Swiss-Prot record:
Required for nucleoid occlusion (NO) phenomenon, which prevents Z-ring formation and cell division over the nucleoid. Acts as a DNA-associated cell division inhibitor that binds simultaneously chromosomal DNA and FtsZ, and disrupts the assembly of FtsZ polymers. SlmA-DNA-binding sequences (SBS) are dispersed on non-Ter regions of the chromosome, preventing FtsZ polymerization at these regions. The lineage of its organism: Bacteria, Pseudomonadati, Pseudomonadota, Gammaproteobacteria, Enterobacterales. The keyword Cell cycle applies. Residues 33-52 bind DNA. This is Nucleoid occlusion factor SlmA. Pfam families: SlmA-like_C, TetR_N. Residues 9-70 form the HTH tetR-type domain. Belongs to the nucleoid occlusion factor SlmA family. It comes from Pectobacterium carotovorum subsp. carotovorum (strain PC1).
Length: 198
């Protein structure tokens, strides 16, 4: 019984990896059908549906992986790092680095791969980015409590500016067919961003 569950889990992971790889390839710029995915995995469409009730559930699983990966690591950054600008820099670098290592998933993060899918998938991605923006805002607010001085501009505006930078870099990555890496020249860009905060 345990072996059967392990095989099923491995097949599920294989299907999700194939979907992520297809999103990374030229197929990712078009709608991915279950027929194409099944052919890529080397199984029938019926076999896909034994592991996932729908393509939406496959995307749900990939979004869950994105959410878990980012939120877990952001929480570790917040736990381990206390200096405001280092926290912000590490969170942005985390998002950009994750996207760079997972180009197919970046198409999901930007919503590009979800254009032809159910609206609730895009809603999940929107909620993820809203949570990240909220965490950035909280880091900025804690700076005022910790150091006794705030920023010249409202924390909400600053948090949205930082997140907009990330989203812009992810969009550029997709638009360039993954030529322009999101972390490219980050060490030069970060001081410019940090200067805007003061």
């Amino acid at each position: 019984m345990a072996e059967k569950e392990s095989t099923k889990r491995n097949r599920r992971e294989e299907i999700l990896q194939a979907l992520a790889q297809m999103l990374e390839s030229s197929d990712g710029s078009q709608r991915i059908t279950t027929a194409k995915l099944a052919a890529n995995v080397g199984v029938s469409e019926a076999a896909l549906y034994r592991h996932f009730p729908s393509k939406t559930r496959m995307f749900d699983s990939l979004i869950e992986f994105i959410e878990d990966s980012l939120t877990t690591r952001i929480n570790l950054i917040l736990q381990d790092e206390k200096e405001t600008f280092n926290r912000l820099r590490l969170i942005l670098l985390l998002i950009l680095g994750f996207a760079e290592r997972n180009p197919g998933l970046t198409r999901i993060m930007t919503g590009h791969a979800l254009m032809f899918e159910q609206d609730r998938l895009q809603d999940r991605i929107n909620q993820l980015f809203e949570r990240i923006e909220s965490q950035l805002r909280q880091v900025l607010r804690e700076h005022k409590l910790r150091d006794g001085k705030g920023f010249q501009h409202d924390e909400t505006l600053l948090a949205s500016q930082l997140l907009a930078f990330c989203e812009g870099m992810l969009s550029r990555f997709i638009r360039s067919e993954f030529r322009y890496r999101p972390t490219q020249e980050f060490d030069t860009r970060w001081p410019l961003l940090a200067a805007q905060l003061n």
